[in-house]
C-alpha cells in the first residue's frame, strides 16, 4: 500500500507553463502576461507531507478569467430564472413589455409603482397591496405590469391574471377548485387585472370571493386594477358584492387614476400614421 502522502501528492496538479511564462528569482513560475506567480510555496511544515514544496496558484489574469466565467454563468442562471418566472407569471406575452424602461413618463402615479418595488419587503411583511381604480385607458394595468416585471427581475415570483381567466380555469380544472386557488395563493404577489369585468352570476361571485378571501387568509399581498369607482366599491349594491369589496378595501390601498386616456391617444396616433402613409 502506498503511503498516504503519495496519494495526496498525486492529487496535486502540475502547473502548465505557457511559452511566455518565466521562473522568478524566488524559483516560482510566473505568468508572462500579468507578471504574477502561477505557483506558491507550501508552508515549511507541509512540504514534506505533500512530497513537494509548491502548489499551483492563480495568477491575476487567471483569476480575472475565472471571475468573468463565474459572472457570466451567474448572469445566465439569472436570465433563465427570470424567463421562467415570466413564462409562468404572465397570461399575456404583451405584459412582458409593461416595464419601467418602456414607460412614457406621463403617468403621475408611476411613482407609486417604484415605491412598491423599492419597499417590497415591507409590503410583503405588512400584507399591503394596491387597489388601482379609475377610468378606462389611464394606465392601471401597465403600472401593475411594471411592478410585476420589476419584481420578477429580482427573482420574485408574481402571477398576473384576471377573473375571466380564473373562472374559465376553475370550470375546466381537474385538480379541484381548492387546489387551484391554493396554487394562486402560493405566489408572493398576486395581481388581478380588470376586476369587475367578470360575469356577475351567483357562481361567479362566489368564486371571486373564494379567491380574494383565500388570498386574505394567506397573509400575502394583492394588487387589483378596476374601472369601478371608489364610491361603487365603498357602497356596493348587494351583500355578495359587499363581502368582496370589503375584503379588497381591507387588503389594498386605493390609488386613483385619472386624466388622459392613453389607449384612445394610441389609437389616434395609429390613425394619423395610417393617413400619413396613405398620403405619401
PLM feature spans:
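Residue-level preference for the first positions of well-ordered beta-strands
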Residues: 127-131, 158, 189, 221
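A short, basic N-terminal segment
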Residues: 1-104, 265-280
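Short glycine-rich substrate-engagement loop in P-loop NTPases that contacts/grips substrate
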Residues: 108-117, 148-189, 199-206
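N-terminal pre-Walker A segment at the start of P-loop NTPase domains
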Residues: 98-123
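Active-site donor-binding loop signature of nucleotide-sugar glycosyltransferases
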Residues: 61, 105, 163, 257-259
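Walker A/P-loop nucleotide-binding motif
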Residues: 124-144
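Walker B catalytic acidic pair
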Residues: 194-195
Amino acid at each position: 500500500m502506498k503511503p498516504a502522502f503519495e496519494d495526496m501528492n498525486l492529487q496535486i496538479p502540475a502547473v502548465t507553463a505557457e511559452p511566455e511564462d518565466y521562473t522568478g528569482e524566488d524559483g516560482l513560475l510566473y505568468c508572462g502576461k500579468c507578471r504574477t506567480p502561477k505557483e506558491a510555496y507550501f508552508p515549511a511544515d507541509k512540504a514534506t507531507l505533500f512530497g513537494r514544496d509548491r502548489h499551483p496558484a492563480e495568477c491575476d489574469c487567471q483569476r480575472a478569467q475565472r471571475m468573468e466565467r463565474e459572472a457570466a454563468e451567474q448572469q445566465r442562471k439569472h436570465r433563465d430564472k427570470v424567463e421562467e418566472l415570466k413564462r409562468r407569471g404572465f397570461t399575456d406575452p404583451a405584459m412582458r413589455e409593461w416595464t419601467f424602461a418602456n414607460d412614457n413618463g406621463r403617468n403621475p402615479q408611476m411613482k407609486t409603482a417604484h415605491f412598491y418595488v423599492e419597499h417590497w419587503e415591507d409590503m410583503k411583511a405588512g400584507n399591503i397591496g394596491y387597489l388601482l381604480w379609475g377610468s378606462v385607458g389611464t394606465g392601471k394595468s401597465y403600472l401593475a405590469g411594471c411592478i410585476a416585471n420589476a419584481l420578477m427581475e429580482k427573482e420574485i415570483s408574481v402571477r398576473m391574471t384576471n377573473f375571466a381567466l380564473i373562472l374559465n380555469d376553475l370550470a375546466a380544472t381537474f385538480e379541484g377548485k381548492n387546489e387551484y386557488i391554493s396554487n394562486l395563493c402560493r405566489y408572493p404577489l398576486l395581481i388581478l387585472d380588470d376586476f369587475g369585468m367578470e360575469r356577475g352570476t351567483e357562481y361567479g361571485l362566489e368564486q371571486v370571493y373564494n379567491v380574494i378571501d383565500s388570498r386574505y387568509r394567506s397573509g400575502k399581498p394583492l394588487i387589483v386594477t378596476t374601472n369601478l369607482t371608489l364610491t361603487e366599491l365603498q357602497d356596493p349594491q348587494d351583500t355578495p358584492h359587499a363581502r368582496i369589496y370589503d375584503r379588497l378595501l381591507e387588503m389594498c390601498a386605493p390609488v386613483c387614476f385619472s386624466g388622459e386616456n392613453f389607449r384612445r391617444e394610441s389609437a389616434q396616433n395609429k390613425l394619423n400614421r395610417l393617413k400619413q402613409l396613405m398620403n405619401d
